[in-house]
Swiss-Prot record:
HAMAP family given in the database record: Ribosomal_bL33
Family annotation (Gene3D superfamilies): Ribosomal protein L33
Keyword Ribosomal protein: yes
Alphabetic keyword roster: Ribonucleoprotein, Ribosomal protein
PROSITE patterns per the UniProt record, alphabetical: RIBOSOMAL_L33 (PS00582)
The keyword Ribosomal protein is annotated on this UniProt entry: yes
One GO biological process term: translation
Organism: Ruthia magnifica subsp. Calyptogena magnifica
Cellular component per GO, a single term: cytosolic large ribosomal subunit
Similarity remark: Belongs to the bacterial ribosomal protein bL33 family.
Taxonomic superkingdom: Bacteria
UniProt protein name: Large ribosomal subunit protein bL33
Length: 51
């Protein structure tokens, strides 16, 4: 089953994206480069739990 996750910016701006992932096939945490509109740069986003 796909679970909702939150991708939090490593630039400490508080910006985040939400997405889903299949935890059975990919149990490791996601790290992906995406655009952060607050600092207007591409930064690494790391997986975090949705509260």
């Amino acid at each position: 089953m796909r679970e909702k996750i939150r991708l939090v910016s490593s630039a400490k701006t508080g910006h985040f994206y939400t997405t889903t992932k299949n935890k059975r096939l990919h149990p490791e945490k996601i790290e992906i480069k995406k655009f952060d509109p607050v600092v207007r740069k591409h930064v690494v986003y790391k997986e975090a739990k949705i509260k």
